[in-house]
Curated annotation (Swiss-Prot):
Function of the protein: Acts as an adapter for the XPO1/CRM1-mediated export of the 60S ribosomal subunit.
Stretches that traverse the bilayer: none
Residues with PTM Phosphoserine: S258, S468
Name of the protein in question: 60S ribosomal export protein NMD3
Keyword Transport attributed: yes
Name of the gene: NMD3
Residues carrying Phosphothreonine: T433, T470
Subcellular localization, as worded in the UniProt entry: Cytoplasm; Nucleus
Motif, Nuclear and nucleolar localization signal: chain positions: 405-422
GO molecular function: ribosomal large subunit binding
Motif (Nuclear export signal): 480-489
Keyword flag Protein transport: yes
GO cellular component, as recorded: cytoplasm; nucleus
Amino acid sequence: MEYMTESTDRSPGHILCCECGVPISPNPANICVACLRSKVDISQGIPKQVSISFCKQCQRYFQPPGTWIQCALESRELLALCLKKIKAPLSKVRLVDAGFVWTEPHSKRLKVKLTVQKEVMNGAILQQVFVVDYVVQSQMCGDCHRVEAKDFWKAVIQVRQKTLHKKTFYHLEQLILKYGMHQNTLRIKEIHDGLDFYYSSKQHAQKMVEFLQCTVPCRYKASQRLISQDIHSNTYNYKSTFSVEIVPICKDNVVCLSPKLAQSLGNMNQICVCIRVTSAIHLIDPNTLQVADIDGSTFWSHPFNSLCHPKQLEEFIVMECSIVRDIKRAAGAGMISKKHTLGEVWVQKTSEMNTDKQYFCRTHLGHLLNPGDLVLGFDLANCNLNDEHVNKMNSDRVPDVVLIKKSYDRTKRQRRRNWKLKELARERENMDTDDERQYQDFLEDLEEDEAIRKNVNIYRDSAIPVESDTDDEGAPRISLAEMLEDLHISQDATGEEGASMMT
């Protein structure tokens, strides 16, 4: 015999709330949600209104105990800062969600919506949503306070070079811009023989000094002065000064090495030409094309000076030029330059064209010179050389003329220059009238030497039409592939996307 069983739907049982008697599903507390919320407030102890400090000058928020950070409105960084203000009472509950409630940017109010959970009576978990109101209070940070009080810098770097030309400083300026080493500076001041960099902390100044040691041959001395002290907290306030001295050698200088240094560099001749100054001094012997690099420590151990300054450059015309194919190398000689060609030339001063006086010399510019070309050089035969190493040399080993570079029409080169460079924002005082000519010399060096401009950001000048890489005279030019577009990306006052805090 078979029995038919009826399928029955099971429904959960209900109980009555012990407070109000409303039928509810069973729970560990045996109480409805409404009554549980009326009896228990899990947000109790969490402040509903908190103040937060904001500096109007630098657009930064104060993060205890002593840090100022830059945050955009409704950003993750600002939300983390707001939650840290209530970190202690918030640790008693479980934070489920947090987010901003939109407010007017100028209202000086920040509202954060929090969702928290907490275990209450008999293991029941209660979830609650509430809003914390943050009042933005204006407070000037310590850095801005020192700026307004004209006592803002803690460290200064005084960069000096004892030369009559600023080619090294122009190159150093472009390296600073390329690698962004000027971002932490408070002020940059230019004087007639160097630059002063002001910083708000000694650590930033030390980082800049390390950068200078990696980019130019130099040495430095550090000193500090006590400004104030607090005997109760045992704190001291110092101002630090870093005196950086760059080697007094620039590109296109003619130098005379000491016999000991010349021998250590591969028995090269003492009279050399400086073809480049980077982290080391790059020299070339115009008689043999032998090259050598001298770092800062070697220079200060065996110092030498420039025999002539740029204002003593004279213009010569090439009368005859022949390439020297067979270069005799002495025993123990150093490296030979592959970018230059040794040539023997007869030249005559353009100021002495009415005479028959000509000069014979060897030069490293044999690949550039042809009869009739103009070239700039130093006349060592008719100038007074006041150098201890030259005075001890045999007069037969001192050349009459040292050629430096080929001469082109400067006006035409400026007119066809379709690129530009950026400059550091700095204060200037006691500027020389010769600065513009020196800057044009630096721009010409960039066009002529690819090794110098590879670490320089060159921007295309849209106002000048694009032409060929060389002009009618054969003057070198920078190709369009080496140029960057000059972009101007604007940011809001907070430094990121989002509305700015209006005060």
